[in-house]
Amino acid sequence: MQNTTVLYVPIGRKTFDIEVAEIYRQKSMEWLKGNCSTVIAPEQIVTSVEELQGFLDSIKGNKIDTVLYQSVTFADGEFMVKILEYFKQPVIVWSVREPSVGGRLRLNSLTGGNSTSNVLRNHQHPFAFVFGNPDEKALQERLLRQINVMRVLKALNELKIGVVGDYPPGFFFSAANEEELKSALGVTLHKMDLQEAFKECVKLPEQEWIGEVERAEKQVIGLNRNDETVTKFAQFSTYIKKHIQSEELDALAMRCWPDFFNDLGAAPCSTLSQFTEDGMVTSCESDIHGSISMFILRELAGGNAPYLGDLVHIDEEKNSVVFWHCGAGAYSLANPSTGATAGVHPNRKIGFAMDFGLKAGEVTIFRVSHTPDGYRLLVMKGNALDVEQPFTGTSVEVELATNASDTLYELMHAGYEPHFALVYGDVTEHLIELGRMLNLETKVYV
């Protein structure tokens, strides 16, 4: 069941076989109710623009994620134009098969879908097309994937990222042009003062921040609650959470070094890890596009916690690469043989950070990338291997679906940013479709 709100609008004309069309509508509605949390729909096929307007007036104010326009029979472009007067969400156009071949063309649904797609293209409105009957598995899978992508498109358009401090010196890839970001992806930014957070968080009374320690103890192995760095982790996390709530933030991009070590006296990795584990994806080094990449992966993968790492090693014999970071990783990503183990930052030797290898499984690797020419997407696939922890900190060895050496050279020559987001599960098809919907160049390695 997808947690999404779909506006289902079955359209037809009475000059076609409306009785057969109604059977299609009933089966479609039954399937939608079984797979989407909320479905808003008329009680029968809408057969005139006047009838459609009456229905649309009756549902004004409803918040939806997707418009599902089913051309149950042929209908002209007036219907879609009327819907666009009321709703600006992306549209899925659905055509069904003819019930029989030979004699009268009973529905002409495919031409109706063709006509509607033409209207949407000429209105420069984002849309997708699906074809098939509601009981066909291939149609169901495609439609679910499409509905999920549409939901993420809407979530992106509402995404508000808290940027906690500027990016470290020389980390130019972490920045974003706010106007271009809003125009291309719909994302907005909220700037926060890191030094102010350091100053104020240590003033918080224990009863306010102790809950963060107790939360960490539920999953982190070897956590010493008496360690001063654990206290500072909890204080800082609590302070930031207040701003997350007051500003209604959906994700974070946080400056980490050198400030955390020099000014707070604690590693940032624990805060990044716990926030991401609990659904507030947080990138390090104030990587705004890294945070967006993590957010998209979590949304498409059903809430699975994503990872963000550098590509640090390649093993040509195993056709594998290693993604690593110095101590950030959501707890649930840990290899079950070790669990999410507490440690110190591998270079600064300050706690508390995470220190574990990631679990095995199918993974999708992704990056929302930016160049002087604009935005592009990178989509890769592989399998995380069940191996010993490659490097201190958090790391994962991934056997790629494509030739690792060739892929490495292509990534470098294309100048991708050195942070790659990763999530467990295969959402490559979703990402490719997302790129099409956003009209972005999408490079695929699957």
Curated annotation (Swiss-Prot):
GO terms assigned for molecular function: L-fucose isomerase activity
EC class name: isomerase
Isomerase found in the keyword field: yes
Highest rank taxon of the organism: Bacteria
InterPro entries recorded: Fuc/Ara_isomerase_C (IPR004216), Fuc_isomerase_C (IPR015888), Fucose_isomerase_N/cen_sf (IPR009015)
E.C. numbers: 5.3.1.31
Gene Ontology biological-process entries: fucose metabolic process
UniProt keywords, alphabetically: Carbohydrate metabolism, Isomerase
GO CC annotations on file: cytoplasm
Reactions that this protein is recorded to catalyse: 6-sulfo-beta-D-quinovose = 6-deoxy-6-sulfo-D-fructose
Isomerase recorded as keyword: yes
Induction of the gene: Induced by growth on sulfoquinovose.
Role summary: Part of the sulfo-TAL (or sulfo-SFT) pathway, a D-sulfoquinovose degradation pathway that produces sulfolactate (SL). Catalyzes the isomerization of sulfoquinovose (SQ) to 6-deoxy-6-sulfo-D-fructose (SF).
Family: Belongs to the SqvD family.
Protein name: Sulfoquinovose isomerase
Gene designation per UniProt: sftI
